[in-house]
Amino acid sequence: MKRILSKLSKETRCYILSALMIFDGFEELDYTTEIRGEMHLDILDLTKSDVENFAIPSYAQIVAHIKSISDYELRDWIITNTYSPVLKSRRNDALQTFLKFCSDLGWDVNEIKDTMKTTEELWDLKPMNYNFRNVPANNDATSGCFSTIAIFFICIAIITIALQ
């Protein structure tokens, strides 16, 4: 995966990191939070300096930038790494935000469902009830996403402190 990601621009990798951190924000902060952040930086081949110099994007900017990714393996990796924290949190607002995110990306629904099923099996967790046709069109799901952006900032701060 690192080889595929290394072909992307640093900007695109920063947008992917932003998406991952939003969904990581649904999990409780614990001793693994810092480790997950460091793993994200490593696989995305980003440094503390890269993250500090990247302007914090809005949800719309994240979606607009990631939407154009066409590599199936990379899409699968993004869905797996955004869905697994949602599964672990067992929070309905997290699931609604994830479904809204998937809907906004406009990627193949069957591809997303297959990846979700694989992720559920990987983490040996029961699936949460989801229905792509009933994704809310209002801002309720998005507001949950925006509230997690604050957690994104906290995670970046933790990573920054840890890497100093």
For each predicted feature, which ranges?
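Small-residue-enriched hydrophobic alpha-helices in membranes
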Residues: 1-163
